[in-house]
Amino acid sequence: MHIAMIAGEYPPRWGGIGSVVFHLAGHLASFGHQVTIITRSHNGIAPAQSGVSIVEVPWLKLPMKFTRSYAKNALKVLKRLHQSEPFDVIHVHLPLASFTSKEFKFMEQNIAPVCCSLHGSWLGEKQGVIRAAKAGESATWLNPNDLAIRLTAKWYSRYEKAGLLNTSISVANSQSTLKEFAEWYALGEQYNAKVILWGCDHKVFRPANMDDEEEQLAHEKIRHQYNCDDEKALSHKTSTDTPMLLAVGRLVARKGYMTLLRAMPNILAKHPGAKLVIIGRGHMKSKLMKEAKKLSISESVFIKSGMSFDDLAQHFRSADLVVYPSYYEGQGLIPLESMSSGTPVVTVDMAPLTEMVDDTVGGLFESGNSQDLANTVNNMLSDAQGRSMKAEAGRKLVLSKYTYEHNVNDFLDIYQSILNNHSKSS
């Protein structure tokens, strides 16, 4: 079949949506399907995949407003392409594409049945920003994107509701996301929806192979780079006295980095050789470093703006523990990438993170509570054997439920189902 994928993120925009769309498209193409990605224009070059074509459209470079301008231009291209190579299914990834009810109905009636992926919600994002601000994270009013979300989330939620109520099916990325839409967007209204949690690339994010000399050298280089390099650490032993904590994600307030930094003095009191490595792009780097200096932990904190997928995957393998203190996620892929890499994860005791993480594969702490975060990290660092068991269990969990192979089979079933229903009704 010919599948149109409308996604506001696509590599080289490697956000959560961009990553899952890239891998889903590649897996669909490997099954012999034709995939056309309609995405926002970018100065970089998208990685090529056989069977996947990419069409870029212009967009207004303003927070939130870009979702509407991008959607309008994407629809124009969709209509034009459909005339020469008809589409069988349209897969729209919300919330980064804002279509009206009329536009969704047009697609359904004149082009092809529509599947909407719900990657969280604008109203949920707004609640996350508010919770982060109340918890003393970096000033959210100073970030244009956070400010736009706080002020306009309610307005733009109408486009998400339009997708939920006017397409063949909506697929939420967690039970938590589906609950948000049921309670905030469509109380008492009829719609067709289900839940499929996204997986991760279990071949890229995999446990360490200590028999691979090149990989071992890469591991040692990372541990030396961050000064967490006692002999046990270099040998991947969980009993190391120089543990490496890893946090990955955009440097924005709702990711909870200030809470993590405030936990570090208590972590260092029990594990003085610990180092924290934060990897992410964003406006907060200087503020985070100032906070680290204020807390007298600068020598134990490193912030990297970004790196290649291979380097990132090696960081996951080389870390002793991944910490994910986010105040809001539609799903949150970092914990899966951590578990897939054989590294236990500490995250918040809130859905949707609790849909993937429990005490068999990691640890949970009260959201926004830096003392509880420190206690959870300390308990896990002090239990080397338990951490090894959690690492093994996490990898098994990912392979059993959370891979792109699972996703492609699930979405092919959905595509076929809405195609069949569309044929019966036409």
Segments and roles (model prediction):
Residues W122, S138-S170:
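Membrane-proximal helix-turn-helix segments that form the acceptor-binding/catalytic region
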Residues S176, G199:
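Carbohydrate-associated surface elements
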Residues N227-E231, K237-K255, L261-M264:
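Conserved donor-binding/catalytic core segment of Leloir-type glycosyltransferases
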Residues M289-M307:
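Nucleotide-activated donor-binding/catalytic signature segment of Leloir-type glycosyltransferases, i.e.
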Residues G306-M307, Q314-A319:
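Short alpha-helical donor nucleotide-sugar binding micro-motif in glycosyltransferases
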Residues Y327:
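Aromatic "clamp/platform" in nucleotide-sugar-dependent glycosyltransferases that forms part
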Residues P344-T347:
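Short hydrophobic beta-strand element within catalytic cores of glycosyltransferases
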Residues D359-S370, N379-Q385:
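Conserved acidic donor-binding segment of nucleotide-sugar-dependent glycosyltransferases
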